[in-house]
């Protein structure tokens, strides 16, 4: 089966940049639509960039475009399980921080083996609070409640991220 990916720059506001993604089948029907919101930094100065001209390549209007909205996601205050993890060299991005996609791996690594074999990931929600630099030891508190994994990552007494992963049973 062939699929097609379209991506385009959306609006920008207060240093935030929207990027839209659409995956469609050969018949043109949308299989997936997503919006990501980015904050762009200068790597050397670690400051938000002031020159945003690069982000506006062209404006494209797509009918039915989803609005990007910040919604509060229910997240438990207390999580019973504990683990820890150190950010390794191979887990870092160009800024020297834990690569964004690896938060998911950290979450998946906490799942019981039987659960991981019998469930498929349905949805992910991540709230990044503060970066995790190379070598940082992070305390992970977590809980598997039904088919939802909740993970809170802290380091140096600061909350760094919240992760919620929802699963569907496959067997």
Question: Predicted regions: what is each one?
Answer:
Residues 2-75, 128-135, 143-171:
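HotDog/MaoC-like acyl-thioester-processing domains
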Residues 72, 82-83:
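A short alpha-helix capping/helix-coil boundary motif
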Residues 79, 85-167:
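Acidic/His-leaning functional-site neighborhoods
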């Amino acid at each position: 089966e062939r699929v097609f990916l379209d991506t385009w720059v959306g609006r920008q506001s207060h240093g935030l940049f929207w990027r839209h993604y659409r995956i469609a089948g050969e018949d043109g029907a949308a299989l997936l639509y997503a919006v990501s919101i980015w904050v762009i930094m200068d790597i050397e100065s670690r400051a938000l960039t002031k020159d945003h001209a690069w982000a506006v390549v062209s404006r494209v209007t797509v009918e039915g475009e989803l609005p990007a909205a910040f919604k509060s996601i229910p997240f438990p205050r207390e999580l019973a399980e504990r683990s820890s993890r150190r950010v390794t060299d191979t887990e870092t991005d160009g800024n020297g921080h834990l690569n964004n996609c690896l938060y998911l791996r950290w979450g998946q690594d906490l799942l019981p083996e039987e659960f991981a074999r019998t469930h498929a990931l349905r949805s992910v929600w991540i709230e990044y609070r503060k970066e995790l630099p190379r070598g940082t030891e992070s305390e992970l508190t977590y809980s598997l409640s039904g088919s939802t994994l909740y993970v809170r990552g802290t380091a140096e007494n600061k909350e760094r991220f919240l992760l919620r992963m929802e699963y569907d049973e496959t067997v």
